[in-house]
Regions:
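Active-site neighborhoods of divalent-metal-dependent phosphate/nucleic-acid chemistry enzymes
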Residues: 74-116
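Short, well-structured N-terminal submotif of metal-dependent ribonuclease cores
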Residues: 1-40, 54-60, 121, 133-138
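Active-site-proximal, substrate-binding regions of enzyme catalytic domains
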Residues: 25, 47-74
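Acidic, PIN/NYN-like endoribonuclease modules and their adjacent C-terminal/linker elements
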Residues: 2, 72, 104-138
Length: 138
């Protein structure tokens, strides 16, 4: 199963943001343990680097951290088709629309995010890290 990790989940892991780090880190380990494929949209990478500047001051350390993390996930393309069709979703938050469009184009089974309300579509299932972990433990 391919699982798209939303930007907030990746930042939680890389910045070790409390109180979200523990569930997000456990989520990533569970995804690997169950042979699922963790995915990140190419468009999210710039957002991740930008947000992490608040948490990791040293530029080299920041970039190395992100580069190392990206070796662990599949990076999904964000194309002209993706960004154009994301407008048609009519989301309040365009970044979330792009994430959903990437998910649809790549046959993603679910999106893991802390902001489920931002993904008001039922096209691709969304879950919080905690809900995903509870489901996997059941």
């Amino acid at each position: 199963m391919k699982i798209l990790l939303d930007t907030n989940i990746i930042v939680d892991i890389l910045a070790q943001r409390s109180p979200f780090f523990e569930d997000s880190f456990k989520l990533l380990n569970t995804i690997y343990d169950q042979n699922h494929i963790p995915c990140v949209s190419a468009s999210a990478v710039t957002d991740i680097v930008y947000i992490l500047r608040k948490y990791i001051a040293d530029k080299k350390k920041l970039l190395d951290t992100v580069k190392d993390f990206l070796k662990l996930v599949a990076i999904l393309p964000t194309t002209q088709h993706t960004v154009s069709n994301a407008f048609l979703l009519n989301f309040d938050d365009y970044e979330d629309a792009v994430q959903l469009q990437v998910a649809m184009e790549n046959k993603i089974s679910r999106i893991i995010t802390r902001n489920q309300k931002d993904f008001r579509s039922h096209i691709v299932a969304t879950q919080t890290p905690k809900a995903f972990l509870q489901e996997q433990e059941a």
